[in-house]
Every structure is written in structure tokens, then in C-alpha cells.
Design a protein with these regions (language model features):
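Short acidic, gly/pro-rich beta-turn/loop elements at beta-sheet edges
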Residues: 249, 265, 447-449
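Conserved helix-loop functional segments at active or binding sites
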Residues: 332
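Alpha-helical transmembrane segments of multi-pass membrane proteins
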Residues: 2-233, 238-251, 258-262, 281, ...
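Class I SAM-dependent methyltransferase Rossmann-like catalytic core
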Residues: 263-285
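SAM/dcSAM-binding transferase cores
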Residues: 431-466
Length: 466
């Protein structure tokens, strides 16, 4: 041990009241996990919420946190200044890097999309985890316990308690009632709030205050003053004019959900809608569906029942706010039908009601159907909701040749429960198309047997089919 190191070790570390130290560690746990939750929510409009997105994001976050623990364990002096500086940097990254306009601009201008994802996670979320991860090992040096285990146990208790309350309060309360921007401000604000208390008792009281005020002003400017999309815990919404002229439509308006076109309506009388909605409405008319009960899983803009009175509609969507937003900003009038705020999988699994028609039109982002709504078990539950002569329609967005693994396997999952279904490709001039799938209730028919030159029962089967 060098003389300098020995002298530094002989000087007792500057201490703070235990309540202040535990409060700082609590805020670290709250804001670090809060930043992860906000980052996952910011990713939804751009890359969805599939396990292939959330799992790597959590993994990168934990890796950065582990590296932060290691870096904090190597700090051998000036503990409070280190934590104070880390809190300021983390607050700046959270308030600016996780702001809605910044995330939207990042994904709008960086291509391909995985590059924007890596920038958001690698340049914003991971540095936050690394900075805040240093807090517990650094401040453990200042806790007054007889045993090292008691010190680390107390610090980890308050940090984990903060993470628990942060995940609960931000997801269930703040995002639900105030929006995602409010969650960003809460995470950054708590870090800035404790910065003035992270100082040596002999240091000036205003240590860190000017920087905190500057970061707070920037946070408010980016998360409040700049134009924001309507955000809830589940989705990001906006209503705008169609970005391009649409043939046959007069002043079309688009209801955007998570940066994808959820619904379309124009100013004609009667109004025109998106092609798959018009095709589905026409199909119901052709089938003579009148005075029937129709279940729609995934509300979108509620255009399937717009200005119709011939059937009873029940919409199910996970976001309680979508009805008010659609009525106020998109339709300009009350929806036709009833609305239930629930997860579609949970609803179909627990409902005892029966419907003449079930429409599956649920998307989380772009062309992404939530993963739990594509399984064979989900389609089995939808079939259980149908009347004996009922019909199920599903709006899929897949390649127009139905050749990708996703398209093939999704159709296979549906037909594993329903048997052979009708498939109508609505767009043939673009790689991705709306595909309308129509299936019928009842037990699926027997699997077909190919005709061959050796055994060809085509003529017999024609007679059997008449």
C-alpha cells in the first residue's frame, strides 16, 4: 500500500445521516427501473413490444447495471461528489433522451430501425443504468454498520424497495393517469430533488443546485413545451390528415396508433374508410348479417360500426382511453356500439357470451399483432365464442404472397382450429398487404388428401359434395 493510499484510508469517509443515505439509494432504485420502464414504452410505437424486443432491452439494462456495480466498487474516495455527479448526468439522460419528441425524431431519421434501437438503448438507457448502478457500492462505504453484510443488505433493501415502488407507481398510476412524459419527469425530478442533499456537511448548500435547475428547465421544455403526441400507458395516438392523396377520398383523416395507421375516414357523405374496413362491411352485407351480435377485438378508430344501426357491436381494447380519443379527435361523434377495456386474450378466455361474428383486428405497432394473440390457443378461444353458424374474420398484415414464415405459421395456427379458411389479399401492388381471413364455427373438416395419377377420386368427391 502506498503512503498516499494509506493516508486516504486513515481518513474516515464523510458521512450523511442514515435517513438521507437511504433516501438517495431509494431514489436510485426508483429512477433506474423507472427509466427502463419508460424506455420499453418508448420503443412500442417503433418496434413493438414482442419478447424479442423486451428481453434484449432488459438484458442490456442489466449488463450496464452490473458494470455500474463493478465501477462503483472501485471508487475509493470523494464518494458524495461521485454520486451527485452521476445523478445529474442520469437525470439529464432520462429527461432528454427518453422524451417523446427525441425518441420519435431518433426513429424517424436513423435507418435501419435496429440502429435507432441500439442508439436509444446503448446511448441513453445503458448509461443511465451504469451511472445509477454505482450508487449502492459507493454509498455503502458511508453506512455505519458493524458488518459489511449489514451495510450492503440495508443499501440493497432500500434500492430494491425503490425499484418495486417505481415499477408499480409509474405503470399503474403515473402513465395511466398522467402519461409517459409525466413518468419521465418523475424519474428525472426525483434524482434532481436529492442532489442538493448529496454533499459534504462542510460544502456549500447550493452544491449542484444550478445544474439541477438547468436540467429541470430542459426537461420541462422537451417533455411539456414541445408538441407531444397523446400518450397512454399502452399506446401513442394522433389524428392527422393523410400524408398522401388517396384516390376517391375527400380530405381523409388518419387515426395513428403507435405510428401505424389504425383507421381512416374521409369527409364524403357517406364517409369512405380504409379498404379492409370497407371490404369487411361489404362482406357482412353480402352475408345478410343483420340484427346480430358482433365482437371486435381491437378498437382502432371504431369505423366498422360507424353510422350503422343494423347490428349490435361490442369493441374490446386494452386501452381505456381509446374510446374518448376516437370520439373526440377522429370520429367527432359517439361510437356505435359498446366498449370494454380489457386485454383481448383475457376477454375471450373468460367470456361466456356468444356472438354471431368475431372480428380480430388487434395490433400493437406497425404490422405487429401481440404475440399472445396469434397462438392456436387464442384462436381456439375465439371459436368458442361463436354461435354454431358464426363466422370469424381476422385482419392480418403480411406479405402479399403469404410466403414468409410469419404469414405461413400464422395462417397455420388459425386453420389448426378452424380448418380451411377463406383468404383474401387486398393489396397486390405492395410488399405488405391487408389479408382478410374468414373462418366458420363448428368442428374443422377432415384434412384433405391430394389427388394423384395413381389414385384420383375427384369425380367421386364432386358427387359427394353435391
Amino acid at each position: 500500500m502506498s503512503a498516499e493510499t494509506a493516508a486516504r484510508a486513515a481518513v474516515p469517509p464523510t458521512s450523511l445521516p442514515a435517513a438521507v443515505l437511504f433516501a438517495v439509494v431509494f431514489v436510485e432504485g426508483f429512477s433506474s427501473l423507472g427509466a427502463e420502464i419508460v424506455a420499453l414504452r418508448r420503443l412500442v410505437p417503433h418496434v413493438g413490444s414482442a419478447i424479442t424486443v423486451t428481453a434484449p432491452t432488459i438484458g442490456f439494462f442489466l449488463l450496464a447495471l452490473a458494470l455500474g456495480y463493478q465501477a462503483g466498487g472501485r471508487v475509493d474516495g470523494d464518494y458524495l461528489a461521485r454520486v451527485r455527479r452521476n445523478f445529474l448526468y442520469a437525470a439529464a439522460l432520462i429527461s432528454l433522451g427518453l422524451a417523446g419528441p427525441v425518441a420519435d425524431a431518433l426513429f424517424a431519421h436513423l435507418r435501419p430501425v435496429p440502429l435507432a434501437y441500439l442508439v436509444l438503448v446503448g446511448a441513453v438507457l445503458c448509461p443511465v443504468a451504469w451511472l445509477l448502478g454505482q450508487t449502492v457500492p459507493v454509498l455503502t462505504n458511508l453506512l455505519r454498520h458493524e458488518r459489511a453484510g449489514a451495510r450492503s443488505g440495508a443499501a440493497l433493501y432500500w434500492s430494491t424497495l425503490g425499484s418495486f415502488l417505481g415499477s408499480l407507481s409509474l405503470s399503474v398510476l403515473v402513465m395511466q393517469w398522467l402519461g409517459v412524459a409525466a413518468a419521465v419527469l418523475v424519474c428525472a425530478g426525483l434524482l434532481l430533488l436529492v442532489v442538493p442533499f448529496i454533499r459534504d456537511p462542510a460544502a456549500p448548500r447550493w452544491a449542484g443546485v444550478p445544474a439541477s435547475l438547468a436540467i429541470a428547465a430542459g426537461a420541462v421544455a422537451v417533455n411539456v413545451v414541445l408538441p407531444q403526441q397523446v400518450e397512454t400507458a399502452y399506446a401513442t395516438y394522433r389524428v392527422a390528415a393523410a400524408p398522401v392523396a388517396l384516390p376517391g377520398m375527400l380530405d381523409p383523416r388518419v387515426f395513428w396508433v403507435n405510428n401505424s395507421v389504425a383507421s381512416l375516414i374521409d369527409g364524403s357523405e357517406p364517409p369512405r374508410y380504409s379498404r379492409y374496413i370497407e371490404r369487411l362491411r361489404a362482406r357482412l352485407e353480402e352475408m345478410g348479417v343483420r340484427n346480430k351480435r358482433i365482437l371486435v377485438l381491437g378498437a382502432g378508430g371504431f369505423t366498422l360500426s360507424h353510422r350503422t344501426t343494423t347490428n349490435d357491436y361490442l369493441y374490446v381494447d386494452i386501452d381505456p382511453a381509446v374510446r374518448e380519443l376516437a370520439e373526440r379527435d377522429f370520429l367527432g361523434e359517439p361510437i356505435r356500439g359498446d366498449f370494454v377495456a380489457a386485454d383481448a386474450r383475457q376477454f375471450v378466455a373468460g367470456s361466456s357470451a356468444r356472438f354471431d361474428v368475431v372480428v380480430v383486428d388487434a395490433y400493437s405497432a406497425l404490422t405487429s399483432i401481440p404475440a399472445h394473440l396469434v397462438t392456436r390457443e387464442f384462436w381456439r378461444d375465439t371459436r368458442k365464442l361463436l354461435e354454431p353458424d358464426g363466422v370469424m374474420f381476422a385482419n392480418l398484415i403480411v406479405d402479399n404472397r403469404l410466403a414468409t414464415p410469419y404469414a405461413r405459421n400464422l395462417l397455420a395456427s388459425i386453420e389448426a382450429e378452424y380448418g380451411r379458411c377463406g383468404v383474401e389479399i387486398l393489396f397486390h401492388d405492395r410488399p405488405q398487404s391487408n389479408v382478410l381471413v374468414q373462418c366458420f364455427a363448428g368442428p374443422p373438416p377432415q384434412a384433405g388428401v391430394p389427388y394423384t395419377d395413381e389414385i384420383n377420386r375427384a369425380d367421386v368427391d364432386i358427387l359427394r359434395s353435391q
